[in-house]
């Protein structure tokens, strides 16, 4: 899925990497010493602003041969509410420092509406630019004093142009651009595109092949194709009704998650919910294996039969309800694309736009299901013994879903064992039934070879884990965290770290967070990363239970979702723009923490 997402957003997302050697010791300028060809940053990008009514306009005059990065523009405020920021998109550019980016080579104007400003109101503007000749300036920060503005209707006359004061460099963040996480890349890449719904539609098609959505194929097939011989038109109608139920439910759930934040997301992924859904999938799988037959009470069957007789070929109401239920079942599978979609909705603040986008995402998930329902009878061979094999195969597919859900709350050893056991059972069954297949010759031999290779591939992860050498196991124990449970304990640890003059890393963790476990397995215990992390005071907040103190801590740190990692410098100050919200591989994570520790 990660590979699919990477391919899909390759043309949309901006990848940022560390800048190359920057900046000398010239105290009177922001440019590198030893080169007289570059002007100071204030001459390269003269920055001014003016205000009219309840709107402030920021103005950059870009010198010829220089450019500003669109991705490095950021605006934040204190004691004032900012409206929707209005600015034009930059032009695509290939930069030796940051790769494919959008830049501004002409004067740039940014309009920002403001309201409800209070005493001490400030607007903090951050930007960064480079010279085409191969030189990059550090990020610049300007603070605009809004408190002097009148909090009421002003005359239409434009105020005199003013120059914002630079932020004190002792507290300003002058780090190089931070690498974007997978979720941030998706959210930023989808923003401000009129064709966003089409992108979400394509993402939905990819999500249709994840472990939680794939088991919906046999369910839909039994609903639409299993109720009798249906025409293509009837099958198309019922499948569309099914997908509409799933899409509407998915859209509502997504909007609730985006508006309610992490609390609802955590509740939907609570261990009790995950265990309940896993039991449901196992129950369905056992019925596919013929252990028992699931059937409704006779009274309900009679009611459904009567309703089915009234609606020839199937119940649209029942199909819609099943689609809605499938939307609920699939909701805990918050893979990186779905998390990015929800992050996009939360950032946009436009529920209508967000609703349309998430509806398109769910419709994309339903497209493969519709194709199976409409063309299934033509694509599949005639009825025969193969149907029992297909039924058993779907049983194994159904068993993959509970493992996918439970690995969020199970130790890695057990999740690895479950995946290996499922693979061994599935490929062992395939090898057992190969001689009973209706075709023979080389096709039967190919099935046997696939089964044998699958058996070895399934057993290897468990063997690698259980028989790992002692050095690998010791490596896993190198990184240890100080556990914190609430805001008070966080403040205590920050105070102790400040006294020790050590930077701090706080990792928000939950058992149901897959990416949190990926951080733990692939990133934190990388030898180079583990060595660099020794310079930090490592804190971890386990919010699995989503208790009151967990919620208070998440709200205090303004955490919208997991994984989230925050950083403080050795002076106890939060490191601006250093937060990570999504999985990051060891190499870019190492660069990230090296910049912070240095």
UniProtKB/Swiss-Prot annotation:
The record lists the membrane-crossing segments as 198-220, 240-262, 274-296, 324-346, 353-375, 385-407, 414-431, 446-468
Q: What UniProt keywords are attached to this protein's entry?
A: Cell inner membrane, Cell membrane, Cytochrome c-type biogenesis, Disulfide bond, Electron transport, Membrane, NAD, Oxidoreductase, Redox-active center, Signal, Transmembrane, Transmembrane helix, Transport
Regarding the membrane, this protein is recorded as:
Multi-pass membrane protein
* Pfam families associated with the record: DsbD_N, DsbD_TM, Thioredoxin_7
Q: What is its main location?
A: membrane
Summary of the function given for this chain in its UniProt record: Required to facilitate the formation of correct disulfide bonds in some periplasmic proteins and for the assembly of the periplasmic c-type cytochromes. Acts by transferring electrons from cytoplasmic thioredoxin to the periplasm. This transfer involves a cascade of disulfide bond formation and reduction steps.
Listed name of the protein = Thiol:disulfide interchange protein DsbD
Organism of provenance: Vibrio vulnificus (strain YJ016)
Gene it is expressed from: dsbD
């Amino acid at each position: 899925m990660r590979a699919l997402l990477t391919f899909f957003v390759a043309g949309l997302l901006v990848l940022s990497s560390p800048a190359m050697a920057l900046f000398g010791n010239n105290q009177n300028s922001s440019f590198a010493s030893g080169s007289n060809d570059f002007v100071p940053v204030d001459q390269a990008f003269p920055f001014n602003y003016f205000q009219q009514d309840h709107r402030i306009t920021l103005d950059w005059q870009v010198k010829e041969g220089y450019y500003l990065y669109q991705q490095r523009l950021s605006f934040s405020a204190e004691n004032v509410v900012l409206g929707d920021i209005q600015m034009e998109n930059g032009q695509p550019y290939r930069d030796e420092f940051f790769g494919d980016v959008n830049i501004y080579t002409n004067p740039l104007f940014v309009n920002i509406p403001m309201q409800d400003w209070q005493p001490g109101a400030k607007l903090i503007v951050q930007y960064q630019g480079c010279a085409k000749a191969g030189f990059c300036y550090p990020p610049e920060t300007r603070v605009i004093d809004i408190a002097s503005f009148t909090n009421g209707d002003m005359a239409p006359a434009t105020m005199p142009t003013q120059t914002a004061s630079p932020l004190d460099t002792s507290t300003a963040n002058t780090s190089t651009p931070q690498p974007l996480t997978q979720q941030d890349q998706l959210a930023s890449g989808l923003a401000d595109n009129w064709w966003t719904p089409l992108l979400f539609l394509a993402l939905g098609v990819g999500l249709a092949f994840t472990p939680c959505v794939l088991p919906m194929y046999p369910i839909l097939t039994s609903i639409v194709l299993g109720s009798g011989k249906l025409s293509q038109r009837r099958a198309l109608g019922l499948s569309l009704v099914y997908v509409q139920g799933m899409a509407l439910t998915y859209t509502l759930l997504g909007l609730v998650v985006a508006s309610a934040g992490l609390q609802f997301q955590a509740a939907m992924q609570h261990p009790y919910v995950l265990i309940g859904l896993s039991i449901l999938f196992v129950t369905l799988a056992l019925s596919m294996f013929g252990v028992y037959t699931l059937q409704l009470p006779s009274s309900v069957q009679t009611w459904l039969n009567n309703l089915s007789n009234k609606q020839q070929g199937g119940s649209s109401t029942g199909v819609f309800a099943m689609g809605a239920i499938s939307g609920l079942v699939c909701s805990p599978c918050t893979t990186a694309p779905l998390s990015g979609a929800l992050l996009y909705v939360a950032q946009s603040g436009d529920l209508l736009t967000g609703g349309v986008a998430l509806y398109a995402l769910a419709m994309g998930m339903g497209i493969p299901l519709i194709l199976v329902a409409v063309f299934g009878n033509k694509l599949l061979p005639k009825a025969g013994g193969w149907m029992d094999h297909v039924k058993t195969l779907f049983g194994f597919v159904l068993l993959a879903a509970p493992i996918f859900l439970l690995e969020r709350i199970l130790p890695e050893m057990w999740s690895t064992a479950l995946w290996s056991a499922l693979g061994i059972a599935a490929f062992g069954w395939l090898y057992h039934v190969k001689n009973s297949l209706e075709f023979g010759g080389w096709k039967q031999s190919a099935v046997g070879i696939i089964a044998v290779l699958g058996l070895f591939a399934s057993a290897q992860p468990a063997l690698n884990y259980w028989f790992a050498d002692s050095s690998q196991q010791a490596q896993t124990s190198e990184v240890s965290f100080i556990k914190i449970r609430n805001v008070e304990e966080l403040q205590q640890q920050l105070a102790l770290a400040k006294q020790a003059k050590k930077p701090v890393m706080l990792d928000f963790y939950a058992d149901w967070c897959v990416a949190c476990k990926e951080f733990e397995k692939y990133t934190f215990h990388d030898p180079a990363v583990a060595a660099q992390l020794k310079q930090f005071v490592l804190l971890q907040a386990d919010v699995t239970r989503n208790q009151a103190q967990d919620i208070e801590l998440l709200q205090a740190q303004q955490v919208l979702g997991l994984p989230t990692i925050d950083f403080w410098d050795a002076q106890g100050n939060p490191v601006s723009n250093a937060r990570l919200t999504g999985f990051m591989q060891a190499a870019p994570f190492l660069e990230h923490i090296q910049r912070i520790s240095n």
